[in-house]
């Protein structure tokens, strides 16, 4: 008999075989495991997970979820110790050969669900069919029936007993369901899908790649966006550049992130006229540095790779800097460093909370050592802001955040938040592999891996990011100017 511990979470959709969400504030018990297949499950033996919450509401963090369609693959003479959202523990014992299903005495009503299904006419009268997509010629029909209805009774029980009703951090009444169901990811940061799902996705992809749909995307690129993972079309503003089909996080421009975080009509930009003057006269055979700067300025409408300014976040005055990867890969040159430095100095003088949203490929090589100097310059003013003035700095890492930004202000936040699936590293995967002649483990530079190693404080989806940052500011005594503006 094998025994396994796992945290149980259930939303109003089908249980998904995915991985973990994130950590936040309230301590949740660790996950333990004795023996189970490594290929079937994702687990972490040493990790404590956390959850955002208020007095009567909470979010669970999940290290292990099992799909209902995969249940027949693991219910062979195993006892599972289950911990529900209220931290109550109980056991479920399956014996597929003897068709036994046992629950401890505290959950006798779950047994009632199971035996009700087993005695139903549907179970007794169901016949085998070659057209049944679930039919497996190598598994006896009786075993399939037993497994199917074990899953059904568990499904019914948890639907009726486990619910999460908090509307914290979101304006939507269904925020928790979407938070839990849509943002559960695997350890590698990619959504797992079954063989049938892949076939369906490929067919769907071929349809979406038709000339008609591509024309729609080109003609309405301000309204619609195409996922670069599954090629599905989505309404840009409503979905926050997150694919509703596969959960893939697409890049956002700095203007889109400002719109996401800052209250309408409160944004006041700073140093918009600051432009790089090619300080080291960088020579390039392909394209002069000045010409390249001009082309990106026309393409993005920005003067350089960062926007800085002040505004209100749910009524709270903040100083905000947002890097834009579309401008030369978000590289940090003298202008980027100077604008961020001036923003921090302004926040220090005005005693404002500081938020920096990072998305960068690192220091800008066209400016040589001047770009590297920005790392020390920004870190120096941050030291005064944090250590001397005791003010609050939140660093938000998006994909990708690498190089000099990671090595300086990106990882200096009092609170370091990352988006799901974000690629965060100092040296890129290709550079490491070429230097060390060793393969970099898949997912080792993903936000989820860094969270487990303690390099991040939380992984927060876009739809809850504004609420999380607002709550953090209030915890550090930064309150809205108008209490009615707090949502």
Curated annotation (Swiss-Prot):
It is found in: Plastid, Chloroplast stroma. Coiled coil: none annotated. Keywords: ATP-binding, Chloroplast, Fatty acid biosynthesis, Fatty acid metabolism, Lipid biosynthesis, Lipid metabolism, Metal-binding, Nucleotide-binding, Plastid, Transferase, Zinc, Zinc-finger. GO terms for biological process: fatty acid biosynthetic process; malonyl-CoA biosynthetic process. A zinc finger (C4-type) spans 227-246. GO terms for molecular function: acetyl-CoA carboxylase activity; ATP binding; carboxyl- or carbamoyltransferase activity; zinc ion binding. Binds 1 zinc ion per subunit. Zn(2+) binds at residues 227, 230, 243, 246. It catalyses: N(6)-carboxybiotinyl-L-lysyl-[protein] + acetyl-CoA = N(6)-biotinyl-L-lysyl-[protein] + malonyl-CoA. Its cofactor is Zn(2+). It comes from the Eukaryota. The keyword RNA-binding does not apply. Its EC number is 2.1.3.15. SUPFAM superfamilies: ClpP/crotonase (SSF52096). InterPro entries: AcCoA_carboxyl_beta, Acetyl_CoA_COase_Trfase_b_su, ClpP/crotonase-like_dom_sf, COA_CT_N. The keyword Metal-binding applies. Residues 223-487 form the CoA carboxyltransferase N-terminal domain. It holds the Pfam family Carboxyl_trans. It is an enzyme of class 2 (transferase). PANTHER family: ACETYL-COENZYME A CARBOXYLASE CARBOXYL TRANSFERASE SUBUNIT BETA, CHLOROPLASTIC (PTHR42995:SF5). Belongs to the AccD/PCCB family. Acetyl-CoA carboxylase is a heterohexamer composed of biotin carboxyl carrier protein, biotin carboxylase and 2 subunits each of ACCase subunit alpha and ACCase plastid-coded subunit beta (accD). Component of the acetyl coenzyme A carboxylase (ACC) complex. Biotin carboxylase (BC) catalyzes the carboxylation of biotin on its carrier protein (BCCP) and then the CO(2) group is transferred by the transcarboxylase to acetyl-CoA to form malonyl-CoA. This is Acetyl-coenzyme A carboxylase carboxyl transferase subunit beta, chloroplastic.
């Amino acid at each position: 008999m094998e025994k396994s511990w796992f945290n149980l979470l259930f939303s109003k959709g089908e249980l998904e075989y995915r991985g973990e969400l994130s950590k936040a504030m309230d301590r949740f018990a660790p996950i333990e495991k004795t023996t189970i297949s490594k290929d079937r499950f994702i687990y972490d033996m040493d990790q404590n997970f956390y959850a955002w919450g208020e007095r009567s509401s909470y979010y669970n963090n999940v290290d292990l979820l099992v799909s209902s369609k995969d249940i027949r693959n693991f219910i062979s003479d195993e006892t599972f110790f289950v911990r529900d959202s209220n931290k109550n523990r109980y056991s479920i014992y399956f014996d597929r050969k003897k068709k036994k299903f046992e629950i401890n005495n505290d959950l006798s009503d779950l047994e009632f669900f199971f035996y009700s299904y087993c005695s139903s006419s549907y179970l007794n009268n169901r016949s085998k069919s070659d057209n049944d997509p679930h039919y497996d010629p190598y598994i006896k029909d009786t075993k399939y029936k037993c497994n199917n209805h074990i899953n059904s009774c568990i499904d019914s029980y948890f639907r009726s007993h486990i619910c999460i009703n908090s509307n914290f951090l979101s304006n939507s009444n269904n925020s928790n369901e979407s938070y839990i169901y849509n943002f559960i990811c695997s350890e590698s940061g990619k959504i797992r899908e079954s063989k049938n799902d892949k076939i369906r996705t490929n067919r769907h992809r071929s349809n979406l790649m038709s000339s008609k749909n591509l024309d729609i995307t080109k003609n309405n690129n301000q309204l619609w966006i195409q996922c670069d993972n599954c090629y599905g079309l989505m309404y840009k503003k409503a979905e926050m550049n997150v694919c509703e089909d596969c959960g893939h996080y697409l890049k956002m421009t700095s203007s889109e992130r400002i719109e996401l975080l800052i209250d309408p009509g409160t944004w006041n930009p700073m140093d918009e006229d600051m432009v790089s003057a090619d300080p080291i006269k960088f020579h390039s055979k392909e394209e002069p540095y000045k010409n390249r700067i001009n082309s990106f300025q026309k393409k993005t409408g920005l003067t350089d790779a960062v926007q800085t300014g002040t505004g209100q976040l749910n009524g709270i005055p903040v100083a905000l800097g947002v890097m834009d990867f579309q401008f030369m890969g978000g590289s940090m040159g003298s202008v980027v460093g100077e604008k961020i430095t001036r923003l921090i100095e302004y926040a220090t003088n005005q005693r404002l909370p500081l938020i920096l949203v990072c998305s960068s490929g690192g220091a800008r090589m066209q400016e040589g050592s001047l770009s590297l100097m920005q790392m020390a310059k920004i870190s120096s003013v941050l030291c005064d802001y944090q250590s001397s003035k005791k003010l609050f700095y939140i660093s938000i890492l998006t994909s990708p955040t690498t190089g000099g930004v990671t090595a300086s202000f990106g990882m200096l936040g009092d609170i370091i938040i990352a988006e799901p699936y974000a690629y965060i590293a100092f040296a890129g995967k290709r550079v490491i592999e070429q230097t060390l002649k060793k393969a970099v483990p898949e997912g080792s530079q993903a936000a989820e891996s860094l969270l487990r190693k303690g390099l991040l404080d939380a992984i927060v989806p876009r739809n809850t990011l504004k609420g999380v940052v607002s709550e953090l500011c209030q915890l550090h005594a930064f309150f809205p100017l108008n209490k009615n503006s707090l949502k």
